[in-house]
Amino acid sequence: MTGSLGYVETQRVVLAGPDDPLHLRGGGRLDHVEVAYETYGSLSPARDNAVFICHALTGDAHAAGLHVGSKKRGWWDNLIGPGKPVDTDRFFVISANLLGGCSGSTGPLSTDPATGAPYCLDFPMLHMSDLVAAHRRLVAHLGIERLHAAVGGSLGGMQVLQWVIDEPDALERAVLVAASSRLSPENIAFSAIGREAIMSDPDFCNGRYVEQGVFPWRGQKVARMMAHITYVSAQSLETKFGHRRRSRGDAWTLGPDYEVEHYLQHQGQVFLGRFDALSYLYLTRLLDYFDPFADPGTAAALRSTATRFQLTSFDSDWRFDSTQSARMTAELKALGVAVDWAELASPFGHDSFLLQPPGYHERIAEFLG
């Protein structure tokens, strides 16, 4: 029976220390790595029913259920739970915050053990492999050798792809939704505008704003407003807002007037305090550099994998449109990888992966088996 998980709790674990640091793809290292995570369901005696959830850019470990004192359900609660596509009556589900994030895992605002102060811009640049490496340590900490599946949308889908490249035998199934193997110039341009808005804010303070007791919220708000436009579709904006204004007649103003403007103002405002500007800079830049099929080692890794891939795109998603899933499918098939891709109809744009367009949840449920 489909139902709710009820109350869940975010846990934290230290997965790297001075004697066992996390060595990064770019040559640096982190002597202290903490990861925030949640688990749902029960691990089978054979430890073979684990499903790892990889979140998108501004997500966190709270993918499903409720926290005590909050009415806000996890960001993928419609997908994860008893009787749902990621069925917690059958699967042991792990959801963890990304390395470089700001919701409990080590990131730019974490304390640098060498200085006792926040890393800020001294935090090392990250590669997608570094995000995978931190989560691989979490999986090992939980006593799991092989995952039944990893499921991710947007950036999370890219992490799933990198996971198979880095550990070709670690996943039985890989589910990528609204993802890409390489950002388009348009996507890179959107992120560049967001970073420029943040770094041009007078309160950015060369990245050390926390020590000054301020936050670059004006720039961060603009960055979120800009990004949010790319998460929805022209159709959904037209349906929701049309050309409606709040003022009447000839009462024109330079301030927000159209309903869509107020909507973007709200989206930008609620982002403040929920996500950190430095994590936004680091993770959007990581996405820009993500291009695994340009690495000669990728082909050899994928030729050896038995992991089965499922790719899903949405016809109204212009952030990661279906041509990007088509390219990934061709890249994988050329290496002999088992892959199934489908484009689904949805009016909701990129955010479709968080919602329930027809056929989407059924598709994932069937693939997970």
Curated annotation (Swiss-Prot):
Class of the enzyme per the UniProt entry, highest EC level: transferase
GO cellular component: cytoplasm
Pathway this chain belongs to: Amino-acid biosynthesis; L-methionine biosynthesis via de novo pathway; O-succinyl-L-homoserine from L-homoserine: step 1/1
Biological process per Gene Ontology, one example term: homoserine metabolic process
Signal peptide, first to last residue: none
InterPro entries for this protein: AB_hydrolase_1, AB_hydrolase_fold, HAT_MetX-like
Main location per the UniProt record: cytoplasm
Domain of life where this protein originates: Bacteria
UniProt catalytic activity: L-homoserine + succinyl-CoA = O-succinyl-L-homoserine + CoA
Record site feature (Important for acyl-CoA specificity), residues: 319
Catalytic-site annotation from UniProt: 154 (nucleophile), 317, 350
Subcellular location: Cytoplasm
AB hydrolase-1 domain location: 49-328
EC number: 2.3.1.46
Annotated substrate binding sites: 224, 351
Entry keyword set: Acyltransferase, Amino-acid biosynthesis, Cytoplasm, Methionine biosynthesis, Transferase
Coiled coil: none
Molecular function GO terms recorded: homoserine O-acetyltransferase activity; homoserine O-succinyltransferase activity
Family: Belongs to the AB hydrolase superfamily. MetX family.
Role this protein plays: Transfers a succinyl group from succinyl-CoA to L-homoserine, forming succinyl-L-homoserine.
Assembly information from the UniProt record: Homodimer.
Protein name: Homoserine O-succinyltransferase
Organism, scientific name: Nocardioides sp. (strain ATCC BAA-499 / JS614)
